Amino acid sequence: DTTRQFQWDKIKERLALLENIQLQPSTWAILQNYKNRNGEAPLVRSFKRNAYGRVADTLGIERYQSVPLYLLTDTLVPERYGQDGELTRFIEDGEKFIKAEPMFTGDEWMIPKKYVKVIGDTIVFNKAVFVDRHNQNIASLERSGKGQWVVRSMNPSTTGRHLPPYAQETPLGMFVLQEKKVKMVFLKDGSKETGGYAPYASRFTDGAYIHGVPVNAPRKTQIEYSPSLGTTPRSHMCVRNATSHAKFIYDWAPVNGTIIFVLE
């Protein structure tokens, strides 16, 4: 299947979801555990090892960099993992846990406080980026009025590929833009040696960034385009773009105020 298209039907569905969840006043939060910075999540009740030799829940969400989700009736052993960066509705505060509803995972869960970053009840999500793993493209849209969204960009991209042990797919989900770097320096596989950098990097989950064409050391100057964009998955997990488009996203999309949808 070499025909590439933008899946506007799926994009419309997700925009409707994004509008509908904002109709009622909510306190929004982000699940966070980048590089296990908030502590390795406890083992879920039933787990498996994936192709990378890492523990994952029964739905395939890895333990590494993820957040433990507990049933409302049992805060001893987590049931599932929630993804770093997932948009979450904060429902109720507690002593060690909060009750919250991760938007992509669904349902209400008890989540240890240290994994939840509350971003408040005044935030409005008027900007959304859609990454399509199947068609290898990216689109950005901005809300111009009730039920109205304008397309700001449509571009070819490449997403992460399944290639153990280092490269893996860009995860599906509904994420909040978490941080931005003008240069995201990367290491050579399996080493501590610098491999180069990716320009205009915007991180949304785990180590996955939307970024420009990677520049391999010793080269320092930026590269605008790669003929592989829009073809097949080829990155470690990141979403590779033409560098000028990565800069557009970097300049246009606010941290904690932009939603990134990864769809199939």
Briefly describe each language-model feature range:
Residues 72-82, 150:
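SH3/SH3-like (including bacterial SH3b) beta-barrel domains
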Residues 62-74, 237-243:
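Short, structured beta-strand/loop micro-motifs enriched in basic residues and often containing a Trp
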Residues 40-65, 223-229:
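Short beta-strand/loop turn elements enriched in aromatics
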Residues 1-27, 184-264:
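Exported/periplasmic cell-wall-interacting domains
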Residues 112-221:
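Gly/Pro-biased beta-strand-loop elements
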Residues 81-84, 171-172, 255-256:
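Short, flexible surface segments
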Residues 1-37, 78-117:
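SH3/SH3-like beta-barrel superfamily modules
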